[in-house]
Regions:
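Short, thiol/selenol-centered motifs that function as redox-active sites or metal-ligating centers
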Residues: 48, 52-64
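Charged/polar positions within long, soluble alpha-helices
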Residues: 60-63, 67, 91-94
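Iron-sulfur (Fe-S) cluster-binding segments and ferredoxin-like electron-carrier domains
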Residues: 23-25, 63-78, 102
């Protein structure tokens, strides 16, 4: 069983119609965050988006941002490095939560 299927994207209009205010706000936010005229050049913006897509495991996002990164001039080497940066940050978050767990373990219960 696959949880994400390309045909699911055909349901986007229905999702937006079911929650029009939220959908409109989300699309406006998404377009603003992914705009081409920002301080971050398009290639790096797409590599950032791709790194996030790897950690959130969004197949649709990986598909879209891989294509956009390639179109913006990103190389396979840059994509590979972005993947390892994302993996390292994700692993760092795991260790940070381990520190929290150690502190909570040693603190008196409330």
């Amino acid at each position: 069983m696959s949880y994400q299927h390309p045909t699911d994207l055909a349901l986007v209009p229905e999702l937006l119609a079911l929650a029009p205010a939220e959908g409109k706000t989300f699309l406006a936010f998404n377009h603003a965050a992914e705009r081409a005229d920002g301080a971050i050049p398009a290639k790096y913006r797409e590599l950032i988006a791709l790194g996030v897509a790897f950690t959130t495991q969004c197949a649709y996002c990986i598909d879209t941002h891989t294509r956009h990164a390639r179109e913006a001039g990103a190389t396979k080497q840059e994509i590979a490095e972005a993947a390892f940066v994302a993996a390292a940050v994700r692993a760092g978050g795991t260790l940070a939560h381990a520190l929290l767990s150690l502190r909570l373990h040693d603190s008196p219960e409330k």
